């Protein structure tokens, strides 16, 4: 089950049924099934608080993914800062909606085993994001 929640922000205008179906399709391309996934949309201050408390990182970010996957079942809590999504969309010349969908699927790709911190991994992640976005 995929749930969409907010903490301190208004729920973004996403089509939940379509988004859920899209997420399941993307996961299936990696041989994964969707378990329990919670999207928590929040502001910059909340994501900074989560980043400090659980990851000991003292910076803002667009998404934090807590991975609870077991085998081929992907599960996790995904915190998304709508403030950072908005500023990133302006920086990269994308619409807010485009950037939000990129970040939504970025977390799913992490749960599917795609990383973006090591040598060459950022490019692989971007290619996977683009492939997933084309499936929308």
Per-region residue spans from a language model:
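Conserved ATP-binding N-box helix of the HATPase_c
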Residues: 109
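An acidic/histidine-cluster motif and surrounding catalytic segment
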Residues: 1-101, 112-136
């Amino acid at each position: 089950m995929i749930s969409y929640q907010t903490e301190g922000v208004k729920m973004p205008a996403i089509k939940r049924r379509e988004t859920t179906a899209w997420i399941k399709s993307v996961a299936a391309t990696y041989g994964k099934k969707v378990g329990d996934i919670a999207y928590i949309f929040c502001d910059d201050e909340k994501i900074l608080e989560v980043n400090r408390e659980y990851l000991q990182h003292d910076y803002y970010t667009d998404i934090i993914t807590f991975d609870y996957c077991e085998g081929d079942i992907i599960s996790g809590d995904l915190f998304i800062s709508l403030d950072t999504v908005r500023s990133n969309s302006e920086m990269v010349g994308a619409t807010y909606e485009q950037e939000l969908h990129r970040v939504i699927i970025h977390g799913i790709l992490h749960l599917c085993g795609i990383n973006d911190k090591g040598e060459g991994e950022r490019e692989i992640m971007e290619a996977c994001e683009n492939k997933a976005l084309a499936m929308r």
